[in-house]
Amino acid sequence: MATVASSAAVAVPSFTGLKASGSIKPTTAKIIPTTTAVPRLSVKASLKNVGAAVVATAAAGLLAGNAMAVEVLLGGGDGSLAFLPGDFSVASGEEIVFKNNAGFPHNVVFDEDEIPSGVDAAKISMSEEDLLNAPGETYKVTLTEKGTYKFYCSPHQGAGMVGKVTVN
């Protein structure tokens, strides 16, 4: 245990009317050891908590992964008239974002004869007159009925700008 002794003189101005009387006694300070509360977990409990955190993180990643959209480019960087990718799969309820990649006017029309029965092509397609004219413009659709859907760009269908999506 350590002790500290100190002494100091205090000078008090005379105009206050106060006077220091006598001498200052040395004081001692004692250092008292203290303990800090440390949570104690067994190694087994710690590993259990880490395992639960890993499972929760993985589950969140899977759920977030299902909410992600698939991006399909309308037109290639080289000027080609194509959907990129042209043949792909999505989960039922997954959003598909068709994005104009070039300055050409494009649209997305689902072929009413090449989609699952009971699906209304007009509800999932752009109008044939409606176009994405500028780079970066998008059209979004979510398909819920499982099956194969064929689609095309009406201004460039004759040039082979067609695609297919399989909904699982």
From Swiss-Prot:
Organism: Spinacia oleracea (Spinach)
Annotated function: Participates in electron transfer between P700 and the cytochrome b6-f complex in photosystem I.
Record localization: Plastid, Chloroplast thylakoid membrane
Classification of source organism: Eukaryota, Viridiplantae, Streptophyta, Embryophyta, Tracheophyta
Cofactors (names): Cu(2+)
Entry's Gene Ontology cellular component terms: chloroplast thylakoid lumen; chloroplast thylakoid membrane
Keywords tagged on the record: Chloroplast, Copper, Electron transport, Membrane, Metal-binding, Plastid, Thylakoid, Transit peptide, Transport
Protein name: Plastocyanin, chloroplastic
Pfam families: Copper-bind
Domain Plastocyanin-like: 70-168
Protein family (similarity comment): Belongs to the plastocyanin family.
Membrane topology label: Peripheral membrane protein
A GO MF term: copper ion binding
Record bears the keyword Lyase: no
